[in-house]
Amino acid sequence: MPLTDTPPSVPQKPRRGRPRGAPDASLAHQSLIRAGLEHLTEKGYSSVGVDEILKAARVPKGSFYHYFRNKADFGLALIEAYDTYFARLLDQAFLDGSLAPLARLRLFTRMAEEGMARHGFRRGCLVGNLGQEMGALPDDFRAALIGVLETWQRRTAQLFREAQACGELSADHDPDALAEAFWIGWEGAILRAKLELRPDPLHSFTRTFGRHFVTRTQE
């Protein structure tokens, strides 16, 4: 899922005293997080340096090391910030009581496509991007990324349980397995859409997943 709004900042963890000439502390922290998310959702972790983030955020180097020990520490903070941002995005779609459960899932995929379209399909999902780079990333990233994905899967599984309860989804489905399959496929569709700079892979995935629902519920 791409970055579509200004993400919330993670809790600040200052390391040293505020550097001279630094902007307001909270603004500097938010600027660093936002610049980091924008660059990493588009370019990935390995190809983006700290200096590039500092330039985009327009903060001095001292401000970066006031909050983060190093680039790896910054990367973990970005995962945390993205997780918080994404939880709110899922709330917006999954908690919409005016829609049936599966319609809420379709709302989420439409919101995701609209977010990618706003950036010309050049920004992808931070979690998916980092997962692709995991072989070159610090080991701490693995547990953080898996934890985020498992949270998304649990929330989606609950949505499928609601769909079963109202007769919208066949009871033959295992909600947990179906949620895992959804996120494996959706992350792949996001990656392909970013590669091709077009929404077609997203449409292909949602059509296929939707047909699976319809076929099973009509049996």
From Swiss-Prot:
The organism of origin for this protein: Cereibacter sphaeroides (strain ATCC 17023 / DSM 158 / JCM 6121 / CCUG 31486 / LMG 2827 / NBRC 12203 / NCIMB 8253 / ATH 2.4.1.)
Pfam families in the record: TetR_C_13 (PF16925), TetR_N (PF00440)
Annotated ranges, domain HTH tetR-type: 26-86
Highest taxon, organism lineage: Bacteria
UniProt xrefs under PROSITE patterns: HTH_TETR_2
Keyword field contains Transcription regulation: yes
Lineage of source species: Bacteria, Pseudomonadati, Pseudomonadota, Alphaproteobacteria, Rhodobacterales
UniProt keywords, alphabetically: DNA-binding, Repressor, Transcription, Transcription regulation
InterPro entries: Homeodomain-like_sf, HTH_TetR, Tet_transcr_reg_TetR-rel_C_sf, TetR_C
Annotated function: A transcriptional repressor for its operon. Probably binds to 2 operator sequences in the promoter.
Gene ablation phenotype (knockout): Loss of repression of its operon.
Residues in the DNA-binding region annotation: 49-68
One GO MF term attached to the UniProt entry: DNA binding
Protein name (database record): Transcriptional regulator AcuR
Region (Disordered) location: 1-25
Induction per the UniProt record: Strongly induced by acrylate, the operon product (20-fold), and dimethylsulfoniopropionate, the operon substrate (DMSP, 10-fold). Part of the acuR-acuI-dddL operon.
